[in-house]
Amino acid sequence: GHESAIELLDKYNDVDVTVYEAGDFISFMSCGMQLYLENKVTAEDDVRNFAPEDVEKKGGHVYANHEVTAIHPENKTVTVKDLTNNSEEEVQYDRLILSSGVTPKVLPVPGNDLKNIYLMRGRDWASKLMSAANDPAIKNVAIVGAGYIGTEASEVFAKAGKHVTLMDMIDRPLGTYLNSELLDVLEPTFKKNMDLKMGVKIEGFNGNGKVESVKTDQGDVPADLVVVSAGVMPNTDWLKGVVDLDQRGWIKTDPYLRTNVKDVYAIGDAILPLSIPAGKPMPIALATTTRREAQYVVDHIFEDKPDRAFKGVIGASALSVFDYHFATAGLNQFSAAKNKLDYQTSFYEDNMRPAYVPEADNPKVYVSLTFNPYTHQILG
């Protein structure tokens, strides 16, 4: 949303731009939370790309604690609720850009309302997690979900001296993000720093007011704190009946990122952008993807018919796991198979520098390539 506002104000001289944010903080980057929790970024307010004044100094308006609750296409208005006093007003628009984002999933199991069951998304949770990492009373930490967020959380608490158990339904940490050869490289590091319980089903949480253990189909896991990172769902319930959604709640857009409602566009984590290697829309919840979408929409927002469609994205991201640093682009074994594509992989290992350089200054480099064996298209 902020990227759209900045781009609009930079590109056009005669636009009135207003940003509404339901939360009390603008543009918190959850992907940077690990840096804050490890004290590499000293202030939680610094974990963001934009501040309200970045928009305001260009002539725009930013309202935090203001939730857009409804769209009225026939009048080209939205209902805005001021969450500080519960007052509402109708606001006119000529063009509307939706960037409503996603909400972390809460596991629908008994005990999910116990204290000390945390999520890892947003500024408020960052503060709670920082307190927990420094709390000597919290000794056993269970992380539910072994994707990017879960592995980041497991590293934070392991470095804080906690006994960490990382668990997931999948058979290996990061199993949906990296090819198997890279997982082979990483797995010993995970096992050295924490307990792994892979291929387990979470059946509930046990405790008396506060969580004491995680109930799984393979036994209970002691936990003074549980961090749940079990995926996300689009924040789109408020759009039902007005904006077309798919069966899972993602906003449907055409190739120009327009919704079914005239002059209403959608960008960000709540849509399914075109994946170039997959050749179809798929979830790619990355800030870089959203920024490309925002730039495209702003470039064409006043055209009756854009002269080109949104070209799509590859989906590139990076992750550090203890002493390893990974970057990925496109599809891997898991996502290629999920999209029913023909694929093979190739793995290469070498040192960064010539062999005569001492080992301490000559780290290993690992490359895993996913490709279509028939067309030779590189998938990721």
What are these regions (language model features)?
Residues 113-137, 206-215, 220-299:
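FAD-site-proximal beta/loop scaffold in flavoenzymes
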Residues 270-380:
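Mid-to-C-terminal Rossmann-like scaffold of FAD/NAD(P)H-dependent oxidoreductases
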Residues 47-48, 140-142, 148-204, 284-290, ...:
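Rossmann-like dinucleotide-binding cores of NAD(P)H-dependent redox enzymes
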Residues 73-74, 87-128, 132-134, 139:
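Glycine/serine-rich phosphate-binding loop and adjoining beta1-alpha1 elements at the start
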Residues 1-63, 148, 155-178:
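Beta1-alpha1 glycine-rich phosphate/pyrophosphate-binding loop at the start
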